[in-house]
UniProtKB/Swiss-Prot annotation:
Organism lineage: Archaea, Methanobacteriati, Methanobacteriota, Stenosarchaea group, Halobacteria
Entry-linked InterPro entries: UPF0175, UPF0175_domain
Residues forming coiled coils: none
Domain of life of the native organism: Archaea
Protein family: Belongs to the UPF0175 family.
Name of the protein this chain belongs to: UPF0175 protein VNG_0066H
Length: 98
């Protein structure tokens, strides 16, 4: 067990946490509360990876959808409009008809 792991286990036990995961979750929540720029960056990363929708990312960032769109534009991140190409649409339709 590494020194860091042992320290985390000790802090979790001393703090009354069920396990280190619970303690780390609380620590991350507190970090994001204190540093809103990290919260925004996390939301951008989750949006870019496809883990969350635009609306959910804005909610996570604590900003309006329009403000989040502006942030994406400021960072040079293109948004997928969600439109299908003709080929994708035909493929979906064919699958649906089967």
């Amino acid at each position: 067990m590494s020194g860091l792991t042992a320290d985390l286990d000790a802090v979790a036990a001393a703090g009354g946490y069920d396990d280190t995961d619970a303690m780390v979750e609380e620590a991350v929540r507190e970090l994001l509360r204190r540093r809103p720029e990290l919260r925004l960056s996390l939301a951008v990363e989750k949006y870019q990876s496809g883990a969350v929708s635009l609306n959910r990312a804005a909610e996570l960032a604590g900003v309006s959808v329009e403000a989040f769109k502006d942030e994406l534009a400021d960072r040079g991140i293109d948004r997928d409009a969600g439109f299908l190409t003709d080929a994708q649409r035909d493929d979906h339709l064919q699958t649906f008809m089967e």
